[in-house]
Design a protein with these regions (language model features):
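Extracytoplasmic "Venus flytrap"
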Residues: 26-47, 70-77, 100, 168-176, ...
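Hydrophobic alpha-helical segments within soluble ligand-binding/sensing domains
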Residues: 80, 142-166, 177, 204-207, ...
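Immediate post-signal peptide segment of exported/extracytoplasmic ligand-binding proteins
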Residues: 18-27, 58-66, 157-163
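Extracytoplasmic ligand/sensor domains, especially the bilobed periplasmic-binding protein
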Residues: 89-197, 246-271
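Short, solvent-exposed loop/beta-turn-alpha elements that line the ligand-binding surface or hinge
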Residues: 57-61, 132-135, 279, 293
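Extracellular/periplasmic periplasmic-binding protein-like sensory domains
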Residues: 235-303
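Gram-negative bacterial Sec-dependent N-terminal signal peptides
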Residues: 1-20
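Beta-alpha junction/loop-to-helix N-cap segments that form part of ligand/metal-binding clefts
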Residues: 37-44, 56-130, 142, 199-206, ...
Length: 303
C-alpha cells in the first residue's frame, strides 16, 4: 500500500510537472471551524514535509514543490468542494493533502477529485465508510479507521472499570461512524450504552442535549465530537448542570484548546488519539522545533 501510494502521488505530480519547475500541492484542511486548533498544527506538519522535499533538490530533476492552502471548514461540504475546485482549476495543484473531516472529505472526493482524476491523501478523515468508498484508486489516508478506534476506546473504558456510558456524537459522517463502531464494540464486551444521541456543532446552548443524556444515565459520558465547538459545549453544559463530571475523549476532542477552555474540571477525564512513539516521531519533533507541535493529534499524519 505504501509503495502504491507513493507511486500514485509521483504519477500525479508528473502529469503536470514534466516541463515545469514548480509542483503545487494543496493543503486542504479546516483552518476555520470546529477543529481549527488541531489544524493549526496539522497544516504546518504537511507544509514541513513539502518544504523538505523541495529543499532536497531530488524531486523531478530538481523541481521545487510549493504548498497551497485551502480551507475545508471541516463541516461545510459546499464550501469545501468550492475550495477544492479552486485548488484544481485555478491553482493547478498536482495532488491534495486532505481533507480533514470525514464528511467534507467524502463530498470532495466524490464531487471534485474523482471527476478531475486528482489524488487525495487525508491525514485525519477516519470514517469507516471511507475504507470501502468507490475512489478510482485516488484516495488514501494515513490515520486508522474509526472501526479500530471504536474497539480501542471500548477496551480503555472497560480497563478503567466502567460498564455503563452515555454517548453523544457530532451529527456527521465522523461522529456517526465512530459512535456506531464504539457502541458495537462496547456492547459486545458486555457494556451498556444508555443513550446514543447526536448533537449539532455551532450551538450556543446544549442544555437540552445534556438533559437527555443525564436522564438516560451512565457512569461517564463519551463525547465523540469536536473540541472547538459542539464537543466543548456538551462538556461545559454537563459540568454546569452536574450531569457528568468524567468524559471520554476520542481523537476529535484531544488537543490543548479543550483543557485551556475547561480547566481543571477535566481532571480525571481520558481519551485516545492515533499516534506512535517511534524513532520517526521523535525525528519529526526535532524537525518541527518551535514552528509547530509535532505531538499534536494528526500533525505527524499530516507530515
Amino acid at each position: 500500500m505504501k509503495k502504491l501510494l507513493l507511486a500514485t502521488v509521483a504519477s500525479a505530480a508528473m502529469a503536470t510537472a514534466v516541463s515545469a519547475d514548480d509542483v503545487k500541492i494543496g493543503v486542504f484542511l479546516g483552518f476555520t471551524g470546529p477543529i481549527e486548533s488541531l489544524v493549526a498544527q496539522m497544516g504546518p506538519g504537511a507544509e514541513a514535509a513539502i518544504a523538505e522535499v523541495s529543499a532536497s533538490g531530488s524531486f523531478m530533476n530538481g523541481s521545487t514543490v510549493t504548498a497551497i492552502r485551502a480551507d475545508t471548514t471541516c463541516v461545510d461540504a459546499g464550501a469545501a468542494t468550492a475550495a477544492a475546485e479552486r485548488l484544481i482549476t485555478s491553482d493547478k495543484v498536482s495532488g491534495i493533502v486532505g481533507g480533514d473531516c470525514s464528511g467534507v472529505t467524502t463530498a470532495t472526493l466524490t464531487n471534485v477529485a474523482m471527476p478531475n482524476g486528482m489524488v487525495m491523501i487525508s491525514p485525519s478523515a477516519t470514517s469507516p465508510a471511507l475504507s470501502t468508498i468507490e475512489d478510482n484508486g485516488l484516495f488514501f489516508r494515513t490515520a486508522p479507521s474509526d472501526a479500530r478506534q471504536g474497539v480501542v476506546m471500548s477496551d480503555i473504558i472497560m480497563e478503567r472499570g466502567y460498564n455503563s456510558v452515555a454517548l453523544t456524537y457530532t451529527n456527521n459522517d465522523y461522529g456517526k461512524g465512530l459512535a456506531d463502531a464504539f457502541a458495537a464494540a462496547f456492547e459486545a464486551a458486555g457494556g451498556e450504552v444508555t443513550i446514543n444521541a447526536s448533537h449539532e456543532d455551532g450551538k450556543a446552548d446544549y442544555s437540552a442535549e445534556v438533559g437527555a443524556l443525564a436522564a438516560a444515565g451512565g457512569e461517564i459520558l463519551v463525547v465523540a465530537g469536536y473540541l472547538d465547538q459542539g464537543g466543548k459545549g456538551i462538556i461545559q453544559a454537563s459540568l454546569d448542570t452536574g450531569a457528568f463530571d468524567t468524559f471520554v475523549l476520542p481523537d476529535g476532542m484531544v488537543g490543548d484548546s479543550l483543557p485551556e477552555a475547561i480547566g481543571t474540571d477535566l481532571d480525571g477525564s481520558f481519551g485516545q488519539a492515533p499516534g506512535t512513539d517511534s524513532e520517526g516521531a521523535a525525528t519529526l519533533v526535532s524537525i518541527a522545533g518551535d514552528s509547530f507541535d509535532a505531538t499534536s493529534p494528526f500533525a505527524a499524519e499530516s507530515y
